[in-house]
């Protein structure tokens, strides 16, 4: 279908699913594999109502995702003990392989199931199979970025702290309270607040050298807050557990599709996009600069793109077949 460029992925997905349901003879033999834009109550409700199977990524904004990951770590605190579902080579030849480990759990999702005779959709909390997957690659990415996050938070606090230090507080309680909101915003550190007491010598009312025997200038007491930062190891460990995992949701039962197959089908998205040319087609260089103004022209261009991709894929298929038959690649 033809949608506005501002149409959300959720709305577009629902339209595509409705069209697929009319085209495919037996939806029960179809598994829709998609990213997290597929996972919302109405879209999953339509999938279930149409009889499609699905595998998708649970968005980070869903509370059930965090709960499932916490449950997985609670049952097996060391990821090495999680079953290996898939592996891929490391970034360099000398690097060890990167593993995907995980297992299935039960989660509940709020669905909007279709009703008969165009009646309002029925809200229902349905149990779903959720596969919690630990990725060595994601864990490594978190570890690599951690020091930068710690440094940025420290620098941000120091910058804000300078503004607090420019103020003078009449009592220790006020000085400590001024640092409270800053410390509460810390994500990667814990802050220990202390208060220093200082005596400030006031300026004399008259300029010049004071006369002999003049009383000393008056002083006043001010309080200055200080904060000492330490890494919050508990917060870092909790963030590492969440960042190193992702959660897939599917309606396939474990005795029908193993955890290995669910993960493999989801990972095949990248293969489909990369080998068919859709990744290039989705890029801004291919689509964004084209302004055709009318729906008819847009449909025509879409048809031309589809024919071009078919020709491209046929050439790629023929070339790969020839390379395999000859047992050698193509020299660049």
What do these predicted regions represent?
Residues 1-332:
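Anion-binding and metal-coordination hotspots
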